[in-house]
Amino acid sequence: MADILTQLQTCLDQLATQFYATLCYLTTYHDNIPATPPPTSTTPSAAPLLAKIPKNASTPPVPASAPQAAQSQSQASPPPPDTANPQTGGQHADQQQQSPDGEGLPAPDSPATFAARQRELARDLVIKEQQIEYLISVLPGIDSSEAEQERRIRELEGELRIVEGVREERRRELGVLRRRLEGVLGVVERGIYSRD
């Protein structure tokens, strides 16, 4: 198990991902009813409509430093398919909407489905935020002053010295027991070979 700070960083990363996914869902599947109706003026705008601008049918420009083979290959390749053609077929048009910039978007969810998914996404965000709050609350030193933390560090250093002393004593006892065992094994070995 990772330490608390690593868990906290992971939860923050997951929360950011959940925020992004929630925003993507909300912008993609809402009913897309404009808050204000579009202007109905008949005066043409200063910018020409994109549909009236002719498209270049030629291949993209190639730098002068490119080899001749690359130029001939790019000229031999067929032009990309024209995606500006309007969609035909009512069934396919019902499944996707055309946005002003021409991108196809999925059909919006029904209001009940959209509301249910909104609640689910909000609940997931709240749960992740509660996990983050819990991890922050269990971080050491949150509710103590600097002096209390220094006192606690000194206490822990004292406990560590005591434990290290006990460890050193056990290591010496182990050395004594090892020497005694070697002596017993030496006597047994001499006794076994002396009978032969």
Swiss-Prot record:
The keyword rRNA-binding is annotated on this UniProt entry: no
GO biological process entries: regulation of transcription by RNA polymerase II
GO cellular component: mediator complex
Sequence segments annotated as region (Disordered): 52-111
Gene Ontology molecular function: transcription coregulator activity
InterPro entries for the chain: Med7/Med21-like (IPR037212), Mediator_Med21 (IPR021384)
Superkingdom to which the source organism belongs: Eukaryota
Coiled coil: 144-174
Signal peptide: none
Principal location class: nucleus
Pfam families according to UniProt: Med21 (PF11221)
Residue spans of biased composition, Low complexity class: 65-76, 87-98
The keyword DNA repair is assigned to this record: no
Compartment annotation: Nucleus
UniProt KW keywords: Activator, Coiled coil, Nucleus, Transcription, Transcription regulation
Function: Component of the Mediator complex, a coactivator involved in the regulated transcription of nearly all RNA polymerase II-dependent genes. Mediator functions as a bridge to convey information from gene-specific regulatory proteins to the basal RNA polymerase II transcription machinery. Mediator is recruited to promoters by direct interactions with regulatory proteins and serves as a scaffold for the assembly of a functional preinitiation complex with RNA polymerase II and the general transcription factors.
Family recorded in the similarity comment: Belongs to the Mediator complex subunit 21 family.
Protein name: Mediator of RNA polymerase II transcription subunit 21
Name of the coding gene: srb7
